[in-house]
Amino acid sequence: MSTPSRSAALFERAQKTIPGGVNSPVRAFRSVGGIPRFIAKAAGPYLWDADGTRYIDYVGSWGPMIVGHAHPEVVRAVQEVAADSFSFGAPTEAEVVMAEEICKLVPSIEQVRLVSSGTEATMSALRLARGFTGRDLIVKFEGCYHGHADSLLVKAGSGLLTFADTTQNAPSSTGVPEDVVKHTMVLPYNDVAALREAFARHGKEIAAVIVEPVAGNMNLVRGSNEFHQAMRALCTEHGAVLIFDEVMTGFRVALGCAQALYGIKPDLTCLGKVIGGGMPAAAFGGRRDIMGFLAPLGSVYQAGTLSGNPLAVAAGLTTLRLIAAEGFHDRLATQTRKLVDGLAEIAREVGVPFAADSVGGMFGIYFREGVPTSFAEVTKSDVGRFNAFFHAMLDQGVYLAPSAFEAGFVSSTHDDAILDATFEAARKAFKAV
């Protein structure tokens, strides 16, 4: 494990003024150990750290950089808008265009509200679902992460899998009252029987079911077709709101999002990451009758100073235009599948227990036999082997997510030459674990 001197110095300095030295916990490398890399710049599929070391990037800012870092057209769009000021706190034509584009690409969304983060989107969608139904109970699933709103921090994924006890049906974070999470029911992901039982017992109390249609915050776990069909049918039958959290999957796994892949029409959808093109942006939207409950029309309050920020909208609109090109997502899915198949083949050659999967431009790697289908199966992966693999790849210039419980991301700039370089590094890394 190498020690980057400049990043090490910055990390030590940062810890004096920033809790833990980072502004989001997973960045601290607590799960994998070692010194987090402080990034200086990025372009295409590459990152450069503060020491000048170049890495092939499979994090992509946790998903937004679907067309690669610093795409010239995205950069130009932001620069042009920035010349007219960064924010107005008033409506703009561009945010209307963004809303129209989202509604065109995602047929289940009849109206949409722009916000600044995925947490805002999910938090607001839940408040809206409760206001619309007049009910309090929320159903979520083990290992799914929907931002850090209090009511959703129970058996949650992402960084909480490193820092919290996820074995108990209790808040995953201190500072969250038990009285808040008592309105949150947590079920096993992909467990149709448990879902049906929950509705049989509590159907008249359930305001909403919120789900990552393809989980990406406990590593990548596909939702089964049966699971999605059951959620849709049960929510319809009992008058609950089905919320697809597509902050991660939205526009990344397909142009119409994961709901297009599964043929499911949720009542509300949460979006983020790609729609900001790397800038802070998110959204929630869905059925017109539900969205009509939002202020200023209705009684469900939601607001944000930077919602619809002009720079974020410019980056997002340009990114959406680029990914709407014919064949974009087919090519992205092909490259991502090449990546996981190639890694799996190398692991077999070396004799390391390993599995990998991908959906669109997302992928998961697991140090275990077989692709997991649930949170329980994910937690049986060999974290020690992943950590060793992570550092062996990092030392050879490949930047993976610094946690065994996070999905990875491929951009349109990850061509065959990039994959070949990744495979060359992987051959050495698998031998090190």
From Swiss-Prot:
Pfam families: Aminotran_3. GO terms for cellular component: cytoplasm. NCBIfam families: hemL, PRK00062.1. GO terms for molecular function: glutamate-1-semialdehyde 2,1-aminomutase activity; pyridoxal phosphate binding; transaminase activity. The keyword Secreted does not apply. Homodimer. Keywords: Cytoplasm, Isomerase, Porphyrin biosynthesis, Pyridoxal phosphate. Its cofactor is pyridoxal 5'-phosphate. PROSITE patterns: AA_TRANSFER_CLASS_3 (PS00600). GO terms for biological process: protoporphyrinogen IX biosynthetic process. It comes from Ralstonia pickettii (strain 12J). Belongs to the class-III pyridoxal-phosphate-dependent aminotransferase family. HemL subfamily. The modification N6-(pyridoxal phosphate)lysine is found at K273. Pathway: Porphyrin-containing compound metabolism; protoporphyrin-IX biosynthesis; 5-aminolevulinate from L-glutamyl-tRNA(Glu): step 2/2. Its EC number is 5.4.3.8. Gene3D superfamilies: Aspartate Aminotransferase, domain 1, Type I PLP-dependent aspartate aminotransferase-like (Major domain). This is Glutamate-1-semialdehyde 2,1-aminomutase. It is found in: Cytoplasm. SUPFAM superfamilies: PLP-dependent transferases. It comes from the Bacteria. InterPro entries: 4pyrrol_synth_GluAld_NH2Trfase (IPR004639), Aminotrans_3 (IPR005814), Aminotrans_3_PPA_site (IPR049704), PyrdxlP-dep_Trfase (IPR015424), PyrdxlP-dep_Trfase_major (IPR015421), PyrdxlP-dep_Trfase_small (IPR015422). It catalyses: (S)-4-amino-5-oxopentanoate = 5-aminolevulinate.
